[in-house]
Amino acid sequence: MSSKRLRLIKSCILSLTLLVGISNALGDPPSKKVTLLLDWYPEAENAGYFYALTHGLYARAGLEVRISPIGPNASVEPQVALGKYDFGLGSSDQVLIARSRGVPLVMVMGSLQHDPVGVMVHDGSPVHTFADLEGRTVAAQPGLPWILYVAKKYQLRNIRIIPLSFDYAPFLRDPNYIQQCFITSEPPIMEHIGVKVRTLWVKDSGCDAYMALESSDRFVAAHPDVVRAFVAASIAGWRGYLADPASTDSEILRRNPAMSAIQLELSRKVLLEYHLVEGPGIAPGSLDPERMRNQYKILRTLDIIHADYDYRIAFTTRFISQP
């Protein structure tokens, strides 16, 4: 039997196993059209949802799911809060901030266990720690909580933030260039093309956000069975993607021509190496209330959240059923 045929058989068995697991967990699933708004274009960081879609996990759960991308200058949270989309991807800090401003969003699952955001420098850069960013210019998205946190923790009084171009060219041209990155994206690509880099992962500074699967209060209250079915299928999708990414990668490449197969492969390796989806004692989709409390305290200390509120309304664990 050829190795290609053997891989195909293994893929079919894995899909059937996941389908049976969801069926047993959910019983008779609801029939519902569901929309999901990504926080970027299709990529490895949202591949679990595409696995669930392409392998029929959503369909088996009674859900007809449409997944839409979003560009760099648009926001997920308002569109989900207003009901334009049933679910969206974002970050737990943004959900906490939105709730503090009266936006009725709720986090229903940890899409990734850690936000992969970081700072990338050339290997020859004198920047080795966050404290070394003092007096330097960093290309980043202005106003993000992690920037304010790092600046306060490391007493960065003279750090200059310039807009991130979402383009590799400035970094490749300038050996002193410093930019925001995703550890799953830019650093492995740079290494692949022969550019040596180092990365400071924001998580290691103590600012440890989740990547969030979020919905609106209204949708969760009106369709709890749909939320439960979508979360269960999405968790199964993440397990499936980590085990067998091939067909899902093909769908991502079809939807995002700017993506490459090698980039997907490199990003998936980082997802596994850094336990971004699951890790020792941590299952896909998990949410830790204590981590959410700590994150709320950070945002409150930074005065990004201006007044106290019950942070527990910003998330729920009731839809996360682990085997």
Go through the PLM ranges and name each one:
Residues 2-13:
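Bacterial N-terminal signal peptides that target proteins for export
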Residues 93, 164-260:
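Pocket-lining segment of extracytoplasmic ligand-binding domains
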Residues 292-323:
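Conserved C-terminal helix/tail region of periplasmic/extracytoplasmic solute-binding proteins
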Residues 11-21:
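Bacterial N-terminal signal peptides
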Residues 222-304:
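Secondary-structure end/capping motifs
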